[in-house]
Curated annotation (Swiss-Prot):
One of its GO terms (biological process) is vesicle-mediated transport. Residues 156-205 are annotated as: WD40-like repeat 4. Residues 315-343 are annotated as: WD40-like repeat 7. Disruption phenotype: Defective in bulk endocytosis as well as in internalization of prominent plasma membrane proteins. Defects in constitutive endocytic recycling of PIN auxin transporters and their polar distribution in embryos and roots leading to altered auxin distribution patterns and associated auxin transport-related phenotypes. Defective in embryonic and postembryonic development. Residues 68-113 are annotated as: WD40-like repeat 2. CHCR repeats lie at residues 551-697, 700-842, 847-986, 993-1138, 1142-1283, 1288-1434, 1437-1580. Belongs to the clathrin heavy chain family. PANTHER family: CLATHRIN HEAVY CHAIN 1-RELATED, CLATHRIN HEAVY CHAIN RELATED. This is Clathrin heavy chain 2. Residues 1227-1536 are annotated as: Involved in binding clathrin light chain. Residues 493-536 are annotated as: Flexible linker. Residues 2-492 are annotated as: Globular terminal domain. The lineage of its organism: Eukaryota, Viridiplantae, Streptophyta, Embryophyta, Tracheophyta.
Amino acid sequence: MAAANAPITMKEVLTLPSIGINQQFITFTNVTMESDKYICVRETSPQNSVVIIDMNMPMQPLRRPITADSALMNPNSKILALKAQVPGTTQDHLQIFNIEAKAKLKSHQMPEQVVFWKWITPKMLGLVTQNSVYHWSIEGDSEPVKMFDRTANLANNQIINYKCSPNEKWLVLIGIAPGSPERQQLVKGNMQLFSVDQQRSQALEAHAASFAQFKVPGNENPSILISFASKSFNAGQITSKLHVIELGAQPGKPSFTKKQADLFFPPDFADDFPVAMQVSHKFNLIYVITKLGLLFVYDLETASAIYRNRISPDPIFLTSEASSVGGFYAINRRGQVLLATVNEATIIPFISGQLNNLELAVNLAKRGNLPGAENLVVQRFQELFAQTKYKEAAELAAESPQGILRTPDTVAKFQSVPVQAGQTPPLLQYFGTLLTRGKLNSYESLELSRLVVNQNKKNLLENWLAEDKLECSEELGDLVKTVDNDLALKIYIKARATPKVVAAFAERREFDKILIYSKQVGYTPDYLFLLQTILRTDPQGAVNFALMMSQMEGGSPVDYNTITDLFLQRNLIREATSFLLDVLKPNLPEHAFLQTKVLEINLVTFPNVADAVLANGMFTHYDRPRIAQLCEKAGLYIQSLKHYSELPDIKRVIVNTHAIEPQALVEFFGTLSSEWAMECMKDLLLVNLRGNLQIIVQACKEYCEQLGVDACIKLFEQFKSYEGLYFFLGSYLSMSEDPEIHFKYIEAAAKTGQIKEVERVTRESNFYDAEKTKNFLMEAKLPDARPLINVCDRFSFVPDLTHYLYTNNMLRYIEGYVQKVNPGNAPLVVGQLLDDECPEDFIKGLILSVRSLLPVEPLVEECEKRNRLRLLTQFLEHLVSEGSQDVHVHNALGKIIIDSNNNPEHFLTTNPYYDSKVVGKYCEKRDPTLAVVAYRRGQCDEELINVTNKNSLFKLQARYVVERMDGDLWDKVLDENNDYRRQLIDQVVSTALPESKSPEQVSAAVKAFMTADLPHELIELLEKIVLQNSAFSGNFNLQNLLILTAIKADPSRVMDYINRLDNFDGPAVGEVAVEAQLYEEAFAIFKKFNLNVQAVNVLLDNVRSIERAVEFAFRVEEDSVWSQVAKAQLREGLVSDAIESFIRADDATHFLEVIRVSEDTDVYDDLVKYLLMVRQKVKEPKVDSELIYAYAKIDRLGEIEEFILMPNVANLQHVGDRLYDEALYEAAKIIYAFISNWGKLAVTLVKLQQFQGAVDAARKANSAKTWKEVCFACVDAEEFRLAQICGLNIIIQVDDLEEVSEYYQNRGCFNELISLMESGLGLERAHMGIFTELGVLYARYRYEKLMEHIKLFSTRLNIPKLIRACDEQQHWQELTYLYIQYDEFDNAATTVMNHSPEAWEHMQFKDIVAKVANVELYYKAVHFYLQEHPDIINDLLNVLALRLDHTRVVDIMRKAGHLRLIKPYMIAVQSNNVSAVNEALNEIYVEEEDYDRLRESIDLHDSFDQIGLAQKIEKHELVEMRRVAAYIYKKAGRWKQSIALSKKDNMYKDCMETASQSGEHELAEQLLVYFIEQGKKECFATCLFVCYDLIRPDVALELAWINNMMDFAFPYLLQFIREYSGKVDELIKDKLEAQKEVKAKEQEEKDVISQQNMYAQMLPLALPAPPMPGMGGGGGYGPPPQMGGMPGMPPMPPYGMPPMGGY
């Protein structure tokens, strides 16, 4: 059966490898699919992650780095459950995350391991442990709750599924276990069914199970069913069963009958078993899926088998329900995600036709609303109706698939049934059944409502509408409107009867709802009429309605102007204003007229409203001049100002300041140009200067930047308004830096008497012209001098101020200024007063009044300049007596004492406050010795040096310098550029230093001589101090200095100094001597001070005499000395001597260097002695390691074994590696064996050719690297047995397999390699790489085993790699097989066709070519078969029929000249009605003269050149062929050609049929004439009947009468009269029935009460009885008897002839 006609369709939705899932992770433990929404894959390499695949977007997987043992996505939402084992325990940690919210919902640590888990509901996880089953809700904080313990039959089972029933009352756990010993290949299935209510379990044998709900007829509540499938082996027989059982039967209700059916497995699938079961709740079908990919489909209700097929070539390990489509998803080992769904178009025909199960077909069609059972349903309905089973017929009609029986005919059929007294009318049963099943259609709703309305049962209608049981229509609304307007409105709305809805809203005065509803449905009512209607009764409602219209999309349907006029016509000014203000808010240019209108009407009637509108500024497009005039008339002057645009108008209005708010007027000035604003201001000042000054000032303040400050100032000056100027500039002053502005403000303030403001500005402002302001204030002669004081004090006009105040006798202000304002300027005031010859008493009083606030220095300077210093004596003495320490006070006082020569030395030496430089400078010309005293007191070095040099006072200078002990001063006086240096040195050496008793002074002097680089002078100085028995003879530092200076300046004296001096720093001086290369002197110093190490270092490092050093070492016998000697010997390469010296020194500190040098010189015997000594002192890994290495180098292996057994800290691993690297394999073997480094030991044994031991060591090491090294060594040594042992441990690692294979192959060991790989197949850890590599080896070296290997292990091969190998080795048959296994059907087909002798096999090729994706390969296959296998080409074409372009196939065969060859194929595909196929077959039929098949082809398939074919065969020698030509002309509507051709062959029946079908009166009447002419009277009579509808009675009678054929026309005449009289009778009958209906209505009203009792049995609500039609029988006329044939004429069928009544 073709796949397209199969009842179940399969589709590959996705392949997991295509979205990056590695093949190794496509397993039961790594992949989960809890619903049709998500697939979850757990990856462990290259890093741990979880991949979530949303089935709505499968090509956009979500990958998250998560480490877990299992991951489950929630069936409904993005909630992920994770399970991971707690390290070091058997416990599992469970977590639940919300991926979208990125939050953890819950977590729990299970005390035992969870072996299986599953989402059993969207809110509940089922957890299965080794012994129990738990449920864990994701809601709240609850922990897992134990549900039941596992039964014994599930012990040691692998749990593969766990499910719960829809009501969560039943649970089922399924596991599988190894098969019985008699048949181990067949896996056992075990099931545990648990009842939550009864808390009981039942153990059963089953591989798969699923729950379902099913409604048993007669039971309102659904029953819970369980379906399970099992396959068991008993007594040598395999039994496969499907069971369907009800769980928890409901007492007193009909129960489900237990069903069971056989599962038929093909022989090739004897060991296959069910792995999953899904129940389609949409179609009530059971899907049983087996491991090897078989699908069984059964009906849930009857357990009837429907379909079986293999849906996957690879094992299926996971399924999930696809609830939305009534199918399921399945995932196989290859990673295909397959979707199985019901083929809705074919399943019913398949069940009814192929299975011949009509009842199941009907039930499934009703259940799933599926097509294909229409005829069966209609036939069944008619049978039930004929059997008067009206209830069953009603139920069948209600459940009919796709509503095929829900028609007016069915309603009429039930209406026509007579009602027996006391019984429920069938029509009521029908409607009741429909209501219980769902919703009525429009016709049914109308008919039922008509009954209800007639009986005034409005409440029934309301209930049905509320339950959505009726389909609303306009007709239904019209019917209901007669009894209830509200209900009718609801019906109109549901039926979208828009005009009726609008009319209803209008009647209810709900106009706002009209707009809302019209917008929703896109309807346009008569808005103007509605608005006028509302205006008459509700003006505010009209405003609201108009506003709602204005907000409609696309604008208001009624023009705003029209709406406004409607309001104004009724004098509704406020309403019109309200409307316009709302709609004109956008302020659009096109609304200018309306803006003007709303302002005009309000300026005339409600000026305050207009003022508010204008103030808001919401309009800008109205007629401004018109509105300006109206505003002026209404007294809205400020608005008129804003609207006028001409200066005269503005000037006229602006003077009305009494009626204009000042602030508004100020703001208006801001809208004018500066020129116009000035003009208006001038007018205002002219009209009322005093009254308008404040407004003008305010305007100037506000807009000074626009108007210009200068212009404003000129304006006020023009009107001489200093008050205005003062107020204007007062606000602007803080922003201006213009000196002129500040001056004018000072001037205006002064002239307006604002003295305090003048004082403030002169004090605070920084921008006025000081000179100009000073002059103005002096000229103004203000009574208050403070402004002038501010100016003069700030800008240093103090002398001018003093002169002004003194000359104007304002002495009080002078005292105030000096005492309070600025005492610091008192010296200037005093100087000016002295210049003005002011009395000294006033000046002294002024000075004494200020006292300590007075700055002394400038005061002294002012008095000194005028030779009036003595004036200050009293003032200065007063300050001193007050305790003043001011230097200037004491300087001045000192100068006065020096000038008066009043014991100046006492003052200079005792006064601590004067400035030595100032006073000393003052004394230099008067007395240099006083200057020296002053300078010495202040340590004024430079000044003192200068004055002593100038006056040759060198002794004073030398003493000062020595006492000073200042390095910089010494540097200066000892500088070679100092002309007086020699005189100073002489005085220092002869006088100053011998007099000194201070070591610090001596030290400073010596240091200064050293710094000045005067060594000879220094030696001279030091010899005098140190060697001539002075106080400093034994001074340690000076002795050091003397020797060091001699070393530097005169080395010949050094040895003498060493012998004569004893108190010097021997080590330091010795080092200096070494640096100065005075080695013997240094050696003497170190010996003198017993510094033997330094002494021997001088001999070794400087004298470079190892012999003298050894001799010295023997003399002193110190370890440290021997150590230095040993190090020197080591440096010189005397390794043995050095080692001996180190041993004498007992020195182990330099063992690293000794080891290095000993190894470089190969002195291992001595090194052993040294290391043994070192080991006694230090515990270093390096020492022990080097000792082992030294033993190995001198071949003392016994000592090595003894040493490593003793306690040691050697790094044995490092030593072993070093020995191995240097090929000391025996020693390395000892080390590696001791530390159990089996890997290194194995490699070492390989080097020693001890292969068996190497293998044993490698086994202990169990390292891939070690195995490889040993294996390769064994291969090289041809120890293939040992090599195979190693190789089996390597090839289980995927990454190392290829390396081993290449190593064997490069050395030609092909058989041994194959043997190794074959042995590897049986390994527990055998992987895909081994199977693949063996296949490649077979392909290269043992071709005969290749195919067997591929077939055995096709699922475990890396097929692409093996494909390349087979292609290289040209194994075409195997290559084809591999392509098929890898679903590379295009390549498989190409290979077969290119290498057909080896690769072609017909059945296989058919399977391949049916699955190829490249369309061109279909036609290549056709060419291939045409050339090589033409005898079976039709078999191939039938396989490809659904994929081929039939036209192209026909062209190929036509060009090849073998069109007849594919005749069977063309017949099979002719149903597609392809032109090329039709023409080719017709051509063949013509050639074969098979006119029957030709006519059949023409009838069934019209796509061909009809006229061309007719013209081709109209002259054929066979009559039947010519008849076909006439038939084609008839079909093509060429009636005349068809009739002419039939006439020619005397085919009169064909002529009549053609004329009848043409529908043309003329042709029919011409044919009558032809028969008359030919004398064919019988044909004439027959033609009258055949063309009855076309022949006019008068023409027929005329022809018959004229040609004496009335007898032959009489049957036609009788029929015509009967038909005519029947029409008349029908008209009379209609009139009588109309009269009866009037009487019947009257009778119905009387029968209402009696008929109401008929509603008792109606479900769910009662229905009124329909009016009973009259019982009418047939018309009394039977069908006409068939006319007997006339002689020589065939029987005449009644073409177009109506049935004749019997007479």
